[in-house]
Design a protein with these regions (language model features):
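N-terminal, post-signal peptide beta-strand-biased segments of exported outer-membrane/organellar beta-barrel
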Residues: 16-133, 387
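Low-complexity, polar-biased intrinsically disordered regions enriched in Pro/Ser/Thr/Gly
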Residues: 2, 86, 428-432
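Short stretches within intrinsically disordered, low-complexity N-terminal or propeptide regions
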Residues: 11-12, 89-92, 253-256
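A broadly conserved detector of short glycine/acidic/proline-rich loop/turn motifs that flank catalytic sites
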Residues: 10, 69-71, 412-414
Length: 453
């Protein structure tokens, strides 16, 4: 039926969050985070992001800068199994004895992720800022398409064959489907703010962050009848998207002897992205026009950055031994997403972090840490083009004091994701049962240089 063909078309014209891999805010902007994970109570230069109020307690007046380079490598995988039609009986279409099975793997690589931090301290006042890619999924490719492409196309082609002037049974073994999707998504952020040391133990921060979104995707689907040039379902998409939004940020830091407590709140960012659609090919029907209307050139789609709360505490047990614990809450459920997708979340995202560092010598510090991420996922939220998985991360690394002005940080973070299984009795609108198992991998390496003068 035409609806299934239109579903296939719409799956190519995916939402703006496709290649972000679901709910994503990049907190790993500095190698110090990778090596320890809990940095929400730091008073070092990476605090420009993680604890800006804490920069009022920088050890000396003057300029403090940090440059970080990271390399991130991910895969997003879908193990799909779904039924297909294979013929017609007196009672209607018949279903194949065995499901169609295929493993879809999407590599995503960001070999160079730069971040720049800076602060100037003078007495009780500190002005600070940073530039970084604070959200987005980098670049990604599904070279073999997606299950939703294949399932909708197979069912749609079968139904259309039966409705032809001369009804024909067209089964998946009679044609070859080729499909692919390439995408990119980045949110570049520039933050500026001011910290004030109100008392010997208390400081506050206020500032703002400008966010610029840039992304795009290209995709196609062809279903060529074997031995011919006949294309049963030509689909194509070439679209870029841009947008911007402002994030107010406030923070507070309390330094109580060996205990330091840092807190930060980032308000929700209202962000709309605008389509710059260069090419769309789809079935030219009234239904098709209605379905692709939100994705035409010039149309805006919500892509809010959720409000975020961070609370952390660090304690110096010994002059050479320090530890930190931290909590993050992302209010994803109240952040606008394409098609109101946020309403399918059961809750916001909770993160629990902890880290420890030990000074082996005056020049060398070793550290490690862990993070647990708990999303409020549901079957209606998860899709082939945008899915998340609960996870835990481990980080390890070192800090090297080169001299009294220069410190180097090196860190490695590995994330283990919990598979998410989604079963459906109406797989991608085909009317047939199917199952997807979503999984991910993630590895990040980083090197940072911090300089004070």
């Amino acid at each position: 039926m035409k609806k299934l063909l239109l579903i296939s078309a719409a799956t190519l014209i995916v939402s703006n969050s496709t290649f972000a891999g679901g709910i994503l805010t990049n907190t790993n902007q500095h190698a110090a985070f990778l090596r320890m994970l809990s940095r929400g109570a730091t008073t070092e230069i990476d605090g420009a992001l993680s604890n800006p109020a804490g920069l009022a307690f920088l050890p000396k007046d003057g300029f403090h800068v940090g440059l970080s380079i990271q390399s991130a490598y991910q895969t997003r995988n879908i193990d799909a199994s779904f039924m297909t039609y294979n013929g017609v009986s007196a009672t209607g279409p018949t279903v194949a004895d065995k499901p169609f099975e295929k493993y879809y793997e999407e590599p995503a690589a960001a070999p160079v992720i730069p971040s720049l931090f800076a602060a100037y301290k003078k007495g009780e006042w500190t002005i600070s800022g940073f530039f970084a890619i604070t959200a987005g999924g980098g670049k990604a490719s599904f070279d073999d398409g997606l299950p939703m492409f294949d399932a909708s196309a197979m069912a749609g082609i079968f139904q259309e064959g039966l409705k032809a002037e001369k009804p024909t049974v067209i089964t998946p073994d009679m044609y070859d489907i080729t499909s692919a999707m390439d995408g990119k998504q980045y949110i570049y952020s520039l933050q500026l703010g001011l910290s004030y040391k109100a008392t010997e133990w208390l400081s506050v921060f206020g500032g703002g962050r400008m966010n610029y979104f840039t992304g795009g995707y290209k995709g196609f689907l062809n279903a060529i009848v074997k031995g011919t040039d006949t294309n049963l379902l030509p689909l194509a998409l070439d679209c870029d998207q841009t947008g911007w939004g402002l994030t107010p940020v406030i923070g507070v830091n309390a330094k109580l002897g060996k205990l330091n407590i840092g807190a930060k709140y980032e308000f929700k960012t209202n962000l709309n992205i605008e389509n710059n659609t260069k090419n769309i090919e789809y079935p030219r029907t009234p239904e098709g026009e209605a379905m692709i209307a939100p994705y035409k050139h010039g149309v805006n789609t919500p892509n809010d950055i959720p409000a975020m709360l961070s609370i952390a505490a660090a304690y110096e047990f010994l002059p050479v031994l320090r530890a930190s614990v931290e909590y993050h809450f992302y209010d994803d459920k109240n952040a606008g997403m394409a098609n109101g997708k946020q309403k399918y979340l059961t809750k916001g995202t909770n993160e629990y972090l902890a880290g420890i560092e030990f000074d082996v010598t005056k020049q060398l510090t070793l550290s490690c840490g862990g993070q647990i991420t708990d999303y409020g996922l549901s079957d209606n939220y998860q899709s082939d083009t945008s899915f998340s998985c609960d996870s835990y991360s481990l980080g390890v690394g070192a800090k090297i004091k080169m001299n009294k002005h220069l410190n180097l940080n090196v860190g490695y973070m590995w994330t283990n994701y919990e598979d998410y299984t989604k079963k459906s009795t109406n797989y991608n609108g085909t009317g047939l049962p199917g199952t997807n198992v979503y999984s991910r991998t993630n590895k990040v390496f980083g090197l940072s240089a911090d300089y004070s003068f």
